[in-house]
Regions:
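Short loop/turn segments that flank or connect secondary-structure elements
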Residues: 1-176
Length: 176
């Protein structure tokens, strides 16, 4: 490994905006959105994301939504057309919240990020990110993690919406 922690720098390649659908275990998920962020995208591209309660029953509430497309409609020649108002998940990148086997929510850096992949190759796969260069991203990640934390805290009532099957799947079935 060469040097100390790296300072994350976005290369504005747009790759993170071209791989928005994730096939994980039993479902396909899209770009997660808070309810107040749904207006950033055309209505026909939005589906539920995570819900608490029993789908179809009174009291069921959707706590997040998701965008259904692989490529962001706001991507314009490698840059974001809504940079100033982009969704929280975009603000948190390259970090994403993940649930560990013990049920804890932690952060994980995406090695699909071109900038991080280049640094990993240069440093033979071992490096640490200078999180001081990612203050805004970490604040956004904390907000985004709230959805996952609420789902884990309500595991017996939490559901994720599968874009492939168009159905709700129990959140607990998706845990590692």
């Amino acid at each position: 490994m060469s040097g100390g922690p790296i300072e994350f720098r976005c290369l504005e390649c747009g790759e993170c905006c071209r791989r928005l659908l994730i096939d994980s275990r039993l479902i396909r998920k899209g770009l997660p959105l808070f309810p107040d962020e749904c207006g950033l995208f055309p209505r026909e591209l939005i589906r539920p994301g995570v819900g608490i309660g029993q789908p179809g029953e009174p009291g069921f509430r959707v706590i997040s939504y998701q965008m259904t497309e692989m490529v962001c409609p706001h991507l314009d020649e490698g840059s974001c057309g809504i940079w100033e108002t982009r969704p929280t998940v975009c603000r948190s990148y390259p970090y994403m919240p993940v649930v560990t086997q013990g049920g804890y929510v932690t952060k994980e850096a995406s090695l699909e990020c071109t900038s991080l992949m280049m640094e990993a190759a240069r440093r033979h796969g071992v490096f640490k990110i200078d999180e001081g260069s990612l203050e805004g991203e970490l604040r956004a990640l904390e907000k985004l993690s709230g959805i996952t934390v609420e789902a884990v805290e309500n595991l017996d009532e939490a559901w994720s919406y599968d874009l492939r099957g168009g159905r709700w799947v129990r959140f607990e079935r998706l845990r590692p």
